[in-house]
């Protein structure tokens, strides 16, 4: 579609805008990039690129910038994920070589690392919580009035709740109750437990535990919270530090969105498999029309369980960012699978 000369000029325009955030004309492009063409030739070819819709004029300058269509063409046809440089690879390798014993901390730290490497906002979607099954309860008294309720799932998720011990309840009551719950509820899905604790379990508790009804709402709340989808952020406000975000109302709305974890989960829950890029208005969200989003999924033992989202400006360095997300997806899959298998043994 484009000649070799047009491709070279187009790449130079994208490279210029990525690092300067400034429109560029033919004279500056020639001076900055040392292209082997005259200023007039570059200007004519920029006219052709503009006719194709790959670059566009801004309101504030006579120079040109890449358009969304141009970025789409660039991502689809002109680049591959960049092989990571030594410092990026070393940081990721060092991170994943640590010993991790629970999934939640690993995923959260992965989000933080990705944001540190990119200076953008990273979002990791946790495994679908309703598919989790209860693997155990612990009830740890703190004093005569409070205790920590610890819920553990088969996917390694740990949920902690500080609860008030009902008046008249003894430690022996609590111990009997936890034993019954572990015996009867382990293996059931959180999706079922958040709706109702089985009647036969309630009847058994009624026979052996005084004031057991006072605890039922505690367990119901715990199941409901544990079954909520988990979203892990890294650099939550990084995207707002980009020059593109100068509209205070849009900044406020974006911050509000980031605080609503379930809304964020619904926004990205259906991301497709593989490395994907959505640019500007392709995101179908007015808050993200100045953003590009790179996504990938991660697996545990061959089963897709979560997603990786990198949110940055449309002028991002696509080759490096795609490379980072791709490596993160593969390495996180490997480590989570190992953690899962270790927990099964």
From Swiss-Prot:
It comes from the Bacteria. Belongs to the HrcA family. Keywords: Repressor, Stress response, Transcription, Transcription regulation. Pfam families: HrcA. SUPFAM superfamilies: GAF domain-like, Winged helix' DNA-binding domain. One of its GO terms (molecular function) is DNA binding. Signal peptide: none annotated. InterPro entries: GAF-like_dom_sf, HrcA, HrcA_C, WH-like_DNA-bd_sf, WH_DNA-bd_sf, WHTH_transcript_rep_HrcA_IDD. Negative regulator of class I heat shock genes (grpE-dnaK-dnaJ and groELS operons). Prevents heat-shock induction of these operons. Gene3D superfamilies: 3.30.450.40, Heat-inducible transcription repressor hrca homolog, domain 3, Winged helix-like DNA-binding domain superfamily/Winged helix DNA-binding domain. This is Heat-inducible transcription repressor HrcA. The lineage of its organism: Bacteria, Bacillati, Bacillota, Bacilli, Bacillales. The gene is hrcA. One of its GO terms (biological process) is negative regulation of DNA-templated transcription. It comes from Listeria monocytogenes serovar 1/2a (strain ATCC BAA-679 / EGD-e).
């Amino acid at each position: 579609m484009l000649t070799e000369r047009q491709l070279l000029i187009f790449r130079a325009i994208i490279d210029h805008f990525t690092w300067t955030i400034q429109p560029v004309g033919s004279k500056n492009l020639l001076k900055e990039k040392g292209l082997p063409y005259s200023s007039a030739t570059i200007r004519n070819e920029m006219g052709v690129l503009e006719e194709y819709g790959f670059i566009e004029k801004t309101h504030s300058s006579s120079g040109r910038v890449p358009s969304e269509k141009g970025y789409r063409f660039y991502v689809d046809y002109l680049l591959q994920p960049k092989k990571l440089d030594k410092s990026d690879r070393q940081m990721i390798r060092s991170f994943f070589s640590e010993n991790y014993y629970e999934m939640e901390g690993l995923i959260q730290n992965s989000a933080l690392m990705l944001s540190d490497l990119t200076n953008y906002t990273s979002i990791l979607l946790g495994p679908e919580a309703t598919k989790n099954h209860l693997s155990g309860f612990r009830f740890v008294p703190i004093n005569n009035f409070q205790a920590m309720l610890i819920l553990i799932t088969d996917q390694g998720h740990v949920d902690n709740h500080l609860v008030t011990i009902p008046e008249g309840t003894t430690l022996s009551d609590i111990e009997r109750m936890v034993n019954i719950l572990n015996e009867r509820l382990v293996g059931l899905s959180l999706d079922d437990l958040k709706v109702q604790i089985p009647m036969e379990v309630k009847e058994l508790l009624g026979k052996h535990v005084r004031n057991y009804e006072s605890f039922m709402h505690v367990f119901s709340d715990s199941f409901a919270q544990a079954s909520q989808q988990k979203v892990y952020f890294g650099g939550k406000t990084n995207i707002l530090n980009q020059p593109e975000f100068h509209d205070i109302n849009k900044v406020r709305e974006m911050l509000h969105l980031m605080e609503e974890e379930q809304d964020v989960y619904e926004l990205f829950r259906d991301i497709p498999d593989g490395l994907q890029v959505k640019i500007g208005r392709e995101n179908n969200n007015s808050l993200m029309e100045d953003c590009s989003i790179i996504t990938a999924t991660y697996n545990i033992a061959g089963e897709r369980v979560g997603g990786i989202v990198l949110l940055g400006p449309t002028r991002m360095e696509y080759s490096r960012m795609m490379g980072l997300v791709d490596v993160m997806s593969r390495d996180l899959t490997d480590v989570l699978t190992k953690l899962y298998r270790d927990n099964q043994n």
